[in-house]
Swiss-Prot record:
Name of the encoding gene: glgA2
Lineage of the organism: Bacteria, Pseudomonadati, Pseudomonadota, Gammaproteobacteria, Chromatiales
Organism of provenance: Nitrosococcus oceani (strain ATCC 19707 / BCRC 17464 / JCM 30415 / NCIMB 11848 / C-107)
Any one GO BP annotation for this protein: glycogen biosynthetic process
Keywords: Glycogen biosynthesis, Glycosyltransferase, Transferase
Official protein name in the record: Glycogen synthase 2
UniProt EC number: 2.4.1.21
InterPro entries: Glyco_trans_1, GS/SS, Starch_synth_cat_dom
One Gene Ontology term of the molecular function aspect: alpha-1,4-glucan glucosyltransferase (ADP-glucose donor) activity
Length: 491
């Protein structure tokens, strides 16, 4: 059976900052269940070393622009069948902060060098006869792995490459000075290669040189071909549109299911949906709000940035707070949004609760305890939290974009009658459009029988990773059966 090497900058439970970590944590496991040999390779952050068993050195690589040899460590997940390799370069990865930011929340100034070293190591290892686990395909993810396809592209015999765009807005763009310092091929400094408005774009390396591209939802695959969502790369993507597929991310129902969630006050399912009220009371206690299980509680879990529509929520709140509702927030992000929320919580202590952090336990508590989940993203490649909300019977309100369009059925009168509706959607990216959608939801909430049917329809949806993994499995088979060599003469 084929060997797939999943190259990523984060993977749960080793290290996670967002949705990529969730995907990298579950997709290789699901691929293994389908019979593939699926390994994972990522940088050797300190946290990764503590979460692996049987960790040992299997190779040492001397790479251009690296002052010291790079060690390759191999280990095994504590749970799961997948082998894991770590690219151990202490000067690049053994440091505090998260994979991309320092403790002050700023980009590491040497991110270009850090992830060039990672990409060089993966490309060298995967095509080395000394490596005892030769992959048939390397599955690259986001800009941090964007140099792997161009490193491999000119080789006569090499693994196939697949590049997944999780969020096109994050591109790994660096200066010409950094490009020169990295000792990269001079031919890469070209509009046909990695040059991007007189800078180098790591993500463009993946977009131009990978054998196939995927995004994390069918709608986002269409959106990024347009100037509105293409982030300056829509022309490149239109040129590769015949080799671009949208595969919807799945939800990890082992971790996110109210039937067996260890983090919530009272477990429940569709047959005992009334137990959700106990979780609402627990959530109100956690945020110091008056306990009243008849009040509609709206929840937001996510980064406090404009992409996630936090400014739309802030714009809608003054009118919204005239209603008998409560709103809870969990997340961190731009300081101005954090301050605005904290000021509102001080002004409306009985209606607004704020936690400026990311707390996994509390995230589960919000999903279980809220009635309505707010997700007014300006763009959303896929989104996972709306999938969790559906499973927990927490009705999502979302802007009709990306994966939100693919996973939420709007509660029109017709869809409600046919018991197809799962949430409320809106199109215009404005506080007034969001407010209208919330008011629609509150009107439905007042009709308890209709609301219960709506929530239970959402709970019955199945966005499991088995479906997504099978789509990747089929695509891998197609790519591995083809032969690739010297695909781009600019190299």
């Amino acid at each position: 059976m084929y060997k797939i090497l999943f190259a990523t900058s984060e993977a749960h439970p080793l290290i996670k900052t967002g949705g990529l970590g969730d995907v990298a944590g579950i997709l290789p496991i699901e691929l293994a269940r389908l019979g593939l040999e699926a390994g994972i390779i990522l940088p050797a952050y300190p946290a990764c070393k503590t979460h692996l068993k049987n960790l040992k050195e299997v190779a040492r690589l001397r790479l251009p622009a690296a002052l010291e040899p790079v060690r390759i460590l191999k280990g095994q997940l504590l749970e799961g069948p997948n082998p894991v390799w770590l690219v151990d370069s202490p000067a690049h990865f053994d440091r505090p902060g998260n994979p991309y930011l320092n403790e002050q929340g700023q980009d590491w100034p040497d991110n270009a060098a850090r992830f060039t070293t990672f990409c060089r190591a993966v490309a060298t290892l995967a095509n080395s006869p000394e490596f005892d686990w030769q992959p048939d395909l390397i599955h690259c993810n986001d800009w941090q792995t964007g140099l792997i396809p161009p490193f491999l592209a000119p080789l006569r015999s090499r693994p196939a490459t697949l590049f997944t765009i999780h969020n096109l807005a994050y591109q790994g763009v660096f200066s010409r000075q950094q490009f020169d310092a990295l000792e990269l091929p001079s031919a890469w400094w070209s509009p046909a290669a990695l040059e991007f408005y007189n800078q180098i774009s790591f993500i463009k390396g993946g977009l131009v040189f990978a054998d196939w591209l995927t995004t994390v939802s069918p709608t986002y695959a269409k959106e990024i071909l347009t100037p509105e969502f293409g982030c300056g790369l829509d022309g490149v993507l239109r040129g590769r549109s015949k080799r671009l597929t949208g595969i919807l991310n799945g939800a990890d129902y082992q971790r996110w299911d109210p039937r067996h969630d260890p983090f919530i006050e009272k477990r429940y399912d569709q047959t005992c949906w009334s137990h959700k009220a106990s979780n609402k009371l627990a959530l109100q206690r956690r945020y110091g709000l008056p306990e009243d299980d008849t009040l509609p509680v709206l929840g937001f879990v996510g980064r406090l940035v404009e992409q996630k529509g936090i400014d739309l929520i802030l714009g809608a709140l003054p009118k919204l707070l005239a209603e008998k509702i409560q709103v809870v927030f969990l997340g961190e992000g731009e300081e101005r949004h954090q301050n605005a929320l904290q000021q509102l919580a001080s002004r409306y202590p009985n209606q607004i609760g704020v936690s400026i952090s990311y707390d996994e336990r509390l995230a589960h508590g919000v999903q279980a305890g809220a009635d309505i989940f707010l997700m007014p993203s300006r763009f959303e490649p896929c989104g996972l939290t709306q999938l969790y909300a559906l499973r927990y019977g927490t009705v999502p309100i979302a802007r009709r974009t990306g994966g939100l369009s693919d996973t939420i059925v709007d509660a029109t009168e017709k869809n409600l009658r046919q018991e197809l509706a799962t949430g409320f959607t809106f199109t215009e990216s404005s506080p007034s459009a969001l407010l209208t959608a919330i008011q629609r939801a509150l009107a439905c909430y007042a009709q308890s029988r209709q609301w219960r049917r709506l929530a239970l329809t959402g709970m019955a949806q199945n966005f499991s990773w088995q479906t997504s993994a099978k789509a990747y499995f089929d695509l891998y088979q197609q790519l591995v059966s083809q032969e690739f060599s010297c695909k781009n003469n600019v190299l």
